[in-house]
Amino acid sequence: AGTLEPGEDPAQTAIRELEEETGFQTTELEPLNSFFLSPGILNERMHLFVATNLTAGPAQREPGEQIENYVVKWDEAMKMACDGTIEDAKTLVGLLLYDQKRR
């Protein structure tokens, strides 16, 4: 997840954050969904995208970022989403929405 920079649209942010946090690069994004994180309290909106045709590279994390990336098969990701291994709400929403879309 990342913050929209001034003048940046959500797709640009997604491409930038993908590279910074994982090292992967893409120019092909498909919007998946967007939603409010805490309606009634905040107007913060989460935008989800599906990135394809990825090119691997080194992550470019900011100082202090503690991120561990995992590559797992799709069935394992779904198991992790459903058994409570994945606890991050935006990750769960993204995985479950994409799972429905790909059926």
Sequence positions of predicted segments:
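Conserved Nudix-box catalytic region and its N-terminal flanking loop in Nudix hydrolases
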Residues: 1-16, 54
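Nudix hydrolase/Nudix homology domain
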Residues: 2, 31, 39-42, 47, ...
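A short, charged helix-loop
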Residues: 59-60
